[in-house]
Amino acid sequence: MSEDEKKAKRSKKATTNGTVGLFDPMTLRGMTVRNRIWLPPMDTYSALAQDGLPTPFHYQHYVSRAMGGFGMVIVEATAVAPEGRISPCDLGLWADEQMDAWRWIVADAKAAGATMAVQLNHAGRKASTGCFSIGYEHESVPEEQGGWQIVGPSANAFGPLDKPRELTVDEIHAIVDRFRDAAWRAYDIGFDAVEIHAAHGYLLSQF
C-alpha cells in the first residue's frame, strides 16, 4: 500500500468513527497541511547583521524542521518595519530587497513537504530590546548600540523599558500598510500562510 493510500485510509477511518489522527492531513480554507504537528513561531534573535535578513542558520533551522516531518513550519516574529523589531537581531520583511534572502529557505522547506507560514509583527513599545549577541536583555538598547526611538499607542512605558513616542493617526495607518506590504512580500516569496502577531504585549495588543 502506497503512502497516499495509507493516508486516504486513515482519513476515511477518521470520518467514520469521529476520531482524527495526529498524522492525518487537514485542510484549512483550501490549504492542505500534511499533518497536525506544527512548528510554532519562536524567535531565535539570530539576524546578527541587524538588517532583518535570514542567515544560513535560519536555513538550517527551518529546512531541517521541514525535513523532519513538521506539517507546518511557522517562521518566527518577522518585523514589518525596522522600528517594529523586538530586538536589533530580529528578522524582517519591510523591504523588497529582503525578499531574495528568504526564497531559498521557503522553497527548500516546501520541497521537503512542509507548509510554510510566517508570523508578522510590530513590537511597538516593547521594541528595541536586547538580544544575546549585544546584551541588554530585558532592557532597551541604547541608540549608540543599535537601538532606536520606540513608538506606541501612548507615551506610557512598558516596565523598565524606554518611554515610547505616541503614534499619530497617520502613523497608525502607515503601520497598517506595512503589515499589508509585508504580507504581499510573503506571498510573492512563496509562503503559504501569514500569522499576525497580536499577543504578548506587542503593538496590536497595546491598543
Language model segments and positions:
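Conserved beta-strand edge residues that scaffold enzyme active sites
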Residues: 79-80, 123-124, 193, 200-201
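Non-globular sequence segments
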Residues: 121-191
